[in-house]
């Protein structure tokens, strides 16, 4: 199994090109099932979860062609299977996003209950309740969600009990082909949801309220393929910016989307970073200074993203002062904390809050990645730890970061992948 070995590195310096957003690419690939003609997606990152999505589409009978340079073409002409099997779904929670498109276009879908990162329950009941309101008959048995509808799904007024990105995306895709108007209230407003909505509109869907908490979808009878470019990955961008801040460096993130990162940029500025932005780039200059501690509370967009929480744990571990980080989205999302403590960090957990006392330096250690963003935080910690850090189980990292060691090497970091 691959590992990353990391030696204490100089301040990061230079330019890094940001990949397409995993969390936008996955639902957009699933949306290919809705299109009657060829659908071409570009700026798709080369990641394990993307490969799993392509395998899933092929398993359903879709023709998936990787055209190179981050382009994927999907043709559903021969799609004739309607079951997403356990062996694929168990490795990636986003497989649940095939449910809405299959049901809306073909009237039938069997999807194994999902797996993915081990961060909390993340129940699928919001997805199922919304589809039932649209007329689907759903039963969960033998580990599978079995959904059926006679004819088309029907438009419905759906109020989401809690903000859920995945459920918003699933219902948005299903509603695009439903009969009549669907209103989704308390919808997720994340940039990746906006990206999916814009993609569906490019296919011919009628959606208003994009980017707000109330989405209105006027169902159409058919959707056509289109060419669509996936947005830049705001979490990858944020991870590199934090790494630069922690190493007291200066970097530019190119092909980025500053507008999607306002809450993260604000916290980095609070920590003492000088940040400049253009239309598609962000520059961070720490000017050689030690970061200042910043309090964080995660929240649905436009609040501070839960996917950046672990990286800010590392920043605060090395900052001047004491800070608290409160996680409100997922339970069980501080699994990186015991690993950072092994590296010398002064941290204490109280319920869903981590209290962090900043110290001058960390020590290299052998640590274990437990989920995707936790593993990124351990890599960042390794860049500034004395001695050698070995990060085990980096298959988690490969689920969400494209060419991570090469990108860090390009900024001057001492990071290597070993077998």
UniProtKB/Swiss-Prot annotation:
It catalyses: phosphoenolpyruvate + UDP-N-acetyl-alpha-D-glucosamine = UDP-N-acetyl-3-O-(1-carboxyvinyl)-alpha-D-glucosamine + phosphate. Its EC number is 2.5.1.7. Keywords: Cell cycle, Cell division, Cell shape, Cell wall biogenesis/degradation, Cytoplasm, Peptidoglycan synthesis, Pyruvate, Transferase. Belongs to the EPSP synthase family. MurA subfamily. This is UDP-N-acetylglucosamine 1-carboxyvinyltransferase. Its main location: cytoplasm. NCBIfam families: murA, PRK09369.1. Phosphoenolpyruvate binds at residues 22-23. UDP-N-acetyl-alpha-D-glucosamine binds at residues 93, 307, 329. GO terms for molecular function: UDP-N-acetylglucosamine 1-carboxyvinyltransferase activity. Cell wall formation. Adds enolpyruvyl to UDP-N-acetylglucosamine. The modification 2-(S-cysteinyl)pyruvic acid O-phosphothioketal is found at residue 117. It is an enzyme of class 2 (transferase). InterPro entries: Enolpyruvate_Tfrase_dom, Enolpyruvate_Tfrase_sf, MurA_subfamily, RNA3'P_cycl/enolpyr_Trfase_a/b, UDP_GlcNAc_COvinyl_MurA. It is found in: Cytoplasm. CDD domains: UdpNAET. GO terms for biological process: cell division; cell wall organization; peptidoglycan biosynthetic process; regulation of cell shape; UDP-N-acetylgalactosamine biosynthetic process. The active site is at 117 (proton donor). GO terms for cellular component: cytoplasm. The keyword Chaperone does not apply. It comes from the Bacteria. Pathway: Cell wall biogenesis; peptidoglycan biosynthesis.
């Amino acid at each position: 199994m691959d590992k990353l070995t990391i030696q204490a590195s100089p301040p990061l310096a230079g330019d890094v090109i940001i990949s397409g957003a995993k969390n936008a690419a996955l639902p957009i690939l699933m949306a290919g099932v809705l299109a009657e003609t060829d659908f071409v997606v570009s700026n798709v990152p080369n990641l394990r979860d993307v490969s799993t999505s392509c395998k899933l589409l092929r398993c359903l009978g879709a023709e998936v062609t990787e055209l190179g340079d981050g382009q994927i073409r999907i043709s559903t002409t021969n799609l004739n299977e309607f079951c997403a099997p356990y062996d694929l779904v168990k490795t990636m929670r986003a497989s649940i996003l095939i449910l809405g498109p299959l049901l809306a276009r073909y009237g039938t879908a069997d999807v194994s209950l999902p797996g993915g990162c081990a961060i909390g329950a993340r129940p699928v009941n919001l997805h199922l309740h919304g589809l039932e309101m649209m007329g689907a008959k759903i039963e969960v048995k033998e580990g599978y969600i079995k959904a059926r509808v006679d004819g088309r799904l029907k438009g419905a007024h759906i109020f989401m009990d809690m903000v859920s990105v995945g459920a918003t995306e699933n219902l948005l895709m299903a509603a695009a082909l439903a009969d009549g108007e669907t209103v989704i209230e308390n919808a997720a407003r994340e940039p990746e949801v906006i990206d999916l909505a814009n993609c569906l509109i490019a296919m011919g869907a009628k959606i208003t309220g994009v980017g707000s908490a109330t989405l209105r979808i006027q169902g159409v009878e058919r959707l056509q393929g289109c060419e669509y470019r996936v947005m830049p990955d705001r979490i990858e961008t944020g991870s590199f910016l934090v790494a630069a801040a922690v190493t007291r460096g200066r970097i530019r993130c190119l092909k980025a989307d500053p507008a999607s990162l306002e809450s993260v940029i604000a916290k980095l500025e609070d920590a003492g970073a000088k940040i400049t932005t253009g239309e598609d780039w962000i520059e961070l200059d720490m000017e050689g200074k030690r970061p200042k501690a910043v309090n964080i509370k995660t929240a649905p967009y436009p609040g501070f993203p839960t996917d950046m929480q672990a990286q800010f744990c590392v920043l605060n571990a090395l900052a001047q002062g004491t800070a608290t980080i409160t996680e409100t989205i997922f339970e069980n999302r501080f699994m990186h904390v015991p690993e950072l403590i092994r590296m010398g960090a002064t941290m204490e957990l109280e319920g869903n809050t981590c209290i962090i006392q900043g110290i001058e330096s960390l020590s290299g250690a052998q640590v274990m990645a437990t989920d995707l963003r936790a593993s990124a935080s351990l890599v960042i910690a390794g860049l500034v730890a004395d001695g050698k850090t070995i990060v085990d189980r980096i298959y988690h990292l490969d689920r969400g970061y494209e060419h991570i060691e090469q990108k860090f090497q390009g900024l001057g970091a001492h990071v290597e992948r070993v077998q």
